[in-house]
Amino acid sequence: MARLAAFDMDGTLLMPDHHLGEKTLSTLARLRERDITLTFATGRHALEMQHILGALSLDAYLITGNGTRVHSLEGELLHRDDLPADVAELVLYQQWDTRASMHIFNDDGWFTGKEIPALLQAFVYSGFRYQIIDVKKMPLGSVTKICFCGDHDDLTRLQIQLYEALGERAHLCFSATDCLEVLPVGCNKGAALTVLTQHLGLSLRDCMAFGDAMNDREMLGSVGSGFIMGNAMPQLRAELPHLPVIGHCRNQAVSHYLTH
């Protein structure tokens, strides 16, 4: 059995209504009783995840912002990675040919330029929400990531624009079909999990991980046992065809797999 279990949240542990199911919570508690280290590896913000862990009384390590931050059980910052200020400036100030909304993250929270109530549906479980700002006045020195939310085809065209403008100065990935992220070079959940396992004196072979999107690719591909959700992005299955595919998040498939 693995010594550490790493879980993506959206599309993996969370059901389509963005809640954790009772079976899932019960399974997580049983893993802890068996001294398996729990790690939540997510694109969500550390502030939100710390709130969720507190509400559930769960002991878990946190990989948040798609690897930009790693926190210990006690909330100590173990690792940080920020976008270079010049990259953040270019992304924020450039006029992109897109209908997607832009969202900026730093240690203080989630920021965007206008109200988009529909996006808050994904945060009903925690109550976490964006803060409205003038994007052009955003401090550039501590931006963890920038993401664009919108139609997938539109985001695919935007991805080409971003590649042309940024070259090798940032890492671009889809954390969902409707969310394209701009991250620091070399920053991903797999790299962050490597940092965490070294801190814990473990190897990646000692880990199992579950995920559904392209931001899970490096993590799933590097651990001893990686599992792809039945509802995963087709691109993820194509990138990691050797990994087993389990059930759908709506059926709490992670819990079902771990208890059967």
From Swiss-Prot:
The active site is at D8. It is an enzyme of class 3 (hydrolase). The keyword Cytoplasm does not apply. GO terms for molecular function: 4-amino-5-hydroxymethyl-2-methylpyrimidine diphosphatase activity; magnesium ion binding; phosphatase activity. Mg(2+) binds at D8, D10, D212. Its cofactor is Mg(2+). The keyword tRNA-binding does not apply. InterPro entries: Cof, HAD-like_sf, HAD-SF_hydro_IIB, HAD_sf, HMP-PP_phosphatase. It catalyses: 4-amino-2-methyl-5-(diphosphooxymethyl)pyrimidine + H2O = 4-amino-2-methyl-5-(phosphooxymethyl)pyrimidine + phosphate + H(+). It comes from the Bacteria. Keywords: Hydrolase, Magnesium, Metal-binding. Its EC number is 3.6.1.-. Belongs to the HAD-like hydrolase superfamily. Cof family. HAMAP family: HMP_PP_phosphat. Catalyzes the hydrolysis of 4-amino-2-methyl-5-hydroxymethylpyrimidine pyrophosphate (HMP-PP) to 4-amino-2-methyl-5-hydroxymethylpyrimidine phosphate (HMP-P). This is HMP-PP phosphatase. The gene is cof.
